[in-house]
Amino acid sequence: MEEVIERFLKYVKFDTQSDEDSNTVPSTDKQLKLGKNLVEELKEIGLSGVSIDDNGYVMAYLPANIEKNVPALGFISHMDTSPDMSGENVNPQFVENYDGNDIVLNKDKNIVLSPKDFPEILKYKGKTLITTDGNTLLGADDKAGIAEIITAISYISKHPEIKHGKICIGFTPDEEVGRGADYFDVKKFGADVAYTVDGGDFGELEYENFNAASAKITVHGRNVHPGSAKDKMINSISVAEEFMRLIPKEQAPEYTEGYEGFYHIVDFQGSVEETKLQYIIRDFSKNKFEDKKKLMLDAAKFINEKYGRNLVEIEIKDQYYNMKEKIDEVKYVVDIAYKAMEEVEVKPLVRPIRGGTDGARLSFMGLPTPNLFTGGVNFHGKFEYIPTFAMEKAVEVIVKIVELYAEK
């Protein structure tokens, strides 16, 4: 299974950081470089229908080798890495037989991956880890997923004794900026059901995610010379702070976990004359999600009525919804993945995604798509790492899922 590690190390050398401020598709041209490389690799391992479209979506399939009518099965990962940290000149480091102590990522900058800060790393004592050098993210999210999918499909294609239906492969751009499913052609992809391989911790199996919305708030003020401002000036920064106090502080990300939703302020820029705020709103429950949006609208209304003028403008846009309602209609996709993990001695960790994946959007586009683990930990930053055995096991899980579908 060294093959999956070699692929991963090759892919992380491609800088594929996406850009949320870009209006192009994909948001960065550099994602296309990896996409074109993957196209050649998929052709080399003998897949059919290999293509990359103008938007950067890579698709291919392995034809069925059985007559039996079984669901066409898809596996999907994304090529871009997070805008949160550089993905240029990634320099992976190997930590063999991890001893449970601090890992010095960068001596010069005193960057240390410590179990004091990240206690879950102790689960991997005795294992080989791939870390960053402290200057970039690693890119396991989601180049580990790409490596695992291609390695599994390559193995299946070389072993005709493994019976399987049609297997569809898709690699998307711009997942990290919320646009991964925007131009995904479900009909062209050709699968009945699919899995994203975009999860984190070893054993994760996810089919619930947040309902998500964004809120943009503009607060209008009135600037007057401060020396003569009494009863005239309206400081939009002060009004914005007043608005923020109406949003439950205890429902911020840093105070929530599990199935708890949150309000998260992600940007605040202002002057006396005008202040702009951006929030994201998240909840697993559709009712609580709607309540959260209403609370924000009511907060704006309250302030406008208090001041007797429309100082606060608010625009709320839904982004994606909890895929559970769509997955429940075809629950066998979760049951098969669960069984596959157990059969290759991986303990399934069924937990909600406190975020979103391409699969959430795709599930509402007619392609039910739960999420499988990659094995990566601490995504989007310099403390990202991945145990090599987890990548190898992910390959085994994908192969076993394919086998179980052929038996369905």
Q: What is the predicted role of each segment?
A:
Residues 2-29, 130-131, 320, 380-381:
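N-terminal capping segment at the start of a domain
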Residues 20, 49, 161-166, 249-262, ...:
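Flexible, glycine/charged-enriched surface loops at secondary-structure junctions
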Residues 23-70, 74-76, 80, 86, ...:
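A non-catalytic alpha/beta surface segment that caps or lines the substrate-entry region
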Residues 68-166, 171:
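Active-site metal-coordination/substrate-binding segment of hydrolases
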Residues 103, 127-140, 173-297, 301, ...:
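Midchain, well-structured core segments that form catalytic/ion-binding scaffolds
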Residues 132-140, 347-351, 382:
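Short pre-catalytic strand/loop immediately N-terminal to key active-site residues, enriched for Gly-Thr
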Residues 234-253, 287-301, 335, 339-342, ...:
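His/Asp/Glu-rich mid-to-C-terminal helical/loop segments that flank catalytic regions of hydrolases
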Residues 238-255, 262-264, 311, 321-370:
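Active-site-adjacent substrate-binding region
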